[in-house]
């Protein structure tokens, strides 16, 4: 049997079984706003404070690319009122299929006009390149050009996302207009103050040299005026050859880096081996805010914590 036909039959059977399960299960209280990226949940929680629930799947500490939807996750999707998506193929395949299957209302951030103009082409962040205009002419362009999809690391995009969520809630729950408006106003004030504080705090480290793994922090770095000396596209794993490890070490020493930033899910002991015998420090950068709870001030706390992770490492030397 053709493999495509087999997969199609499996999907039909999968959703048919789920449909039966949902009919039999009680309609308990589930989140009204749902997303798969925790920092988007932070933004939603700020606007939905005392209005409605916000929930994030996958569970805390699990990366989206390594997570498979569970039946209970699909129940959450079924009972949610709104789904916040980034779009452009970044969400898990079956998550989007489930959202479409249950005909849920969605906010696709990359389709929002004011956000489209803030999207950055990956080449924008390379030194010596001519600055590209932040415009997207049509859907085809966003599908064919590689854009940085870690939108929540941009305070500007976060603000536009908050406005969209505000408008969505206002349309759905006009009786809670006072609270929803108050939440957006509070978010704007807190974000503005936080941005000023962070820009002031990073002044002392702006000229410090550092490396990151993967080009995932560019929105944040660009906004706050930080400039990495370079990035390593591939994080060394357990099976990585010694030659590549020494190549990384030589690059760090050549560029006189004083810090290398990694993500919590990486094997830190490999970096310890690379920087052994040098003055180079290492530090975690948590772009998902795994230890931050979903509360009204989560997003600004996330920005502060991320900036402090930069500062704590770069101020050591």
From Swiss-Prot:
GO terms for cellular component: periplasmic space. The keyword Zinc applies. The keyword Cell inner membrane does not apply. Keywords: Disulfide bond, Ion transport, Metal-binding, Periplasm, Signal, Transport, Zinc, Zinc transport. It is found in: Periplasm. One of its GO terms (molecular function) is metal ion binding. Disulfide bonds join 259-313. Its main location: periplasm. Residues 1-31 form the signal peptide. It holds the Pfam family ZnuA. InterPro entries: Bact_metal-bind_prot9, ZnuA, ZnuA-like. GO terms for biological process: zinc ion transport. PANTHER family: HIGH-AFFINITY ZINC UPTAKE SYSTEM PROTEIN ZNUA, HIGH-AFFINITY ZINC UPTAKE SYSTEM PROTEIN ZNUA-RELATED. Part of the ATP-binding cassette (ABC) transport system ZnuABC involved in zinc import. Binds zinc with high affinity and specificity and delivers it to the membrane permease for translocation into the cytoplasm. Belongs to the bacterial solute-binding protein 9 family. This is High-affinity zinc uptake system protein ZnuA.
């Amino acid at each position: 049997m053709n493999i495509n036909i087999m997969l199609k039959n499996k999907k039909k059977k999968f959703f048919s079984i789920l449909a039966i399960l949902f009919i039999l299960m009680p309609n308990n209280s589930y989140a009204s706003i749902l997303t798969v990226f925790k920092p988007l949940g932070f933004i939603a929680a700020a606007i939905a404070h005392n209005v409605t629930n916000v929930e994030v799947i996958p569970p805390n500490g699990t990366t989206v690319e390594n997570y498979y939807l569970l039946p209970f996750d699909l129940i959450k999707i079924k009972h949610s009122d709104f789904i916040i998506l980034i779009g452009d193929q970044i969400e898990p395949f079956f998550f989007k299929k489930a959202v479409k299957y249950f005909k849920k209302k969605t906010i696709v951030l990359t389709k929002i006009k004011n956000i489209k103009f803030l999207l950055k082409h990956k080449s924008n962040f390379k030194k010596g390149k001519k600055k590209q205009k932040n415009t997207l002419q049509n859907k085809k362009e966003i599908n064919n050009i590689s854009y940085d999809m870690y939108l929540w690391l941009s305070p500007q995009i976060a603000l536009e996302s908050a406005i969209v969520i505000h408008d969505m809630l206002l349309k759905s729950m006009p009786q809670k207009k006072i609270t929803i408006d108050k939440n957006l106003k509070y978010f704007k004030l807190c974000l503005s103050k936080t941005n000023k504080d962070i820009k002031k705090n990073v002044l002392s480290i702006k000229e410090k040299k550092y490396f990151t793994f993967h080009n995932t922090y560019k929105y944040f770095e660009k906004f706050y005026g930080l400039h990495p000396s370079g990035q390593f596209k591939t994080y060394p794993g357990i099976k990585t050859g010694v030659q590549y490890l020494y190549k990384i070490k030589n690059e760090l020493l050549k560029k006189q880096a004083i810090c290398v930033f990694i993500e919590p899910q990486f094997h830190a002991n490999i970096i310890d081996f690379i920087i052994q015998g040098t003055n180079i420090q290492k530090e975690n950068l948590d772009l998902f805010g795994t230890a931050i709870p979903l509360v009204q001030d989560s997003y600004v706390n996330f920005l502060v914590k991320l900036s402090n992770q930069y500062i704590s490492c770069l101020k050591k030397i």
